[in-house]
Amino acid sequence: MAGDPASDPHSVVATIQPAITLLGLGIGAALASRALRLNPIVGYLGLGFALSGLGMAQLFNGPLVAAMAEAGVMFLLFNLGLHFSLGRIRAEAGNIFGFGSLQMLVAGGAFAGLFAAFGLPLAFAVIAGFAMGLSSTAVVIGLVRERGQEDCPVGRAAQSILIFQDIAAILLLVAAGALASGGALLPELGMAGAKALAAFAIAVLFARYLTEPLFGLIARAGTTEVYTATALFIALAAGWATGMAGLSLTLGAFLGGMAVADSRYRILVQTEIDAFRGLFLSFFFISVGLSINPALLIEDWLLVLGVTIALITLKCALNVAAGLVNRWSVPGSIQLGFLLGQGSEFALVLLALPAVAGLAEPRLVAALVAAIAISLAVTPAISNIGRKLAGRLRAGPPDAKLAGDDAPVLIIGMLPAGRAVADALEFNDIGYLALEADHDRFQMALADGYHVHRANPADPRSWDA
């Protein structure tokens, strides 16, 4: 219709222009990051911060960019769900509900106690404190995937803890909503828990009875585009459904991926979704950079610097403590603690809610938001420090049971194939001895918890050692 604004080409152009601009700038940021040997996440965050510094943040605050940023996190959680079949959730239940709850109690409880000790209102101390105990799913999972750590002990534990944190974030959002409405907290939390259990049950039923027939029907159609459309539909529709139920969109996306994880079509679905995940995640990280207020950094740089250092230092130390309490080794606890040592995108959402932000001084809330955003940007560097420190601590004598002369399996090289073999052997409690000639790969494998020796398998002398 001529009078319909949606049919006006100028209106359409104005709507999509911010997204197109960020997409083009994001490509440049990714290329620059690679040229500087930095993680692309740093480039995206830096781009957002630079645009904010130029006073252009408001140009990109539209609903389209926000929706694309949210979609990026949804696709990330959908991809994570693809790796967590029902069998794996049962196998990782100790990490998810045991280690995950322990980490939240230690880190979140400590931050809540710290806020209360500084005289902040109890409601703010509890909600903001436990929000600071959360880590960034988007950043951590991105790093884990980039490093090929999905199936190593540290990677599995990190993913499990993040799943529990996603559930905890939902409860915090419910608590913040009850605070805003003045309603009773316990009934609200109980309702949220019941909804989450119902969503999980629906995902289990979908996985058991509908996934295989659905994709079998699509396979008979023989059209690859339908696979792509179906994968997108499951990820987005699952998130939409939980969002309509008052839960987080990301929980629904995770459950959607989990529903497909046990099917024979998982690899195909993951292949179709990967490109969208990377594309939309770039919008999320740029949006985080845009949220940093440069004027605040200049005016209150000492406060922001102090809060940032305190956040990262305390978070890493508390995570390490949680690992040690969970009977992890010192090197493993250090690597995991540093990997999860940043703030969370959910914390940014919680601190932006008027019911929460209104309980503390705006200056403090702004400093917390800036500190969280900065912690996301420096996560690759902080994580590398933890990884190298763990590698040095692990450089002592190897575990005799798994890496001694009597180990029944010899692995040559710790490339992805070698790591996959080692993961399978460790999962089945079978000893192995791994050899790696490349020093960098040796250090990374050592830091990731593998039982590996530095040796050149092509040298005959190695076989007599």
Predicted regions and their residues:
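A solvent-exposed beta-alpha-beta segment
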Residues: 409-465
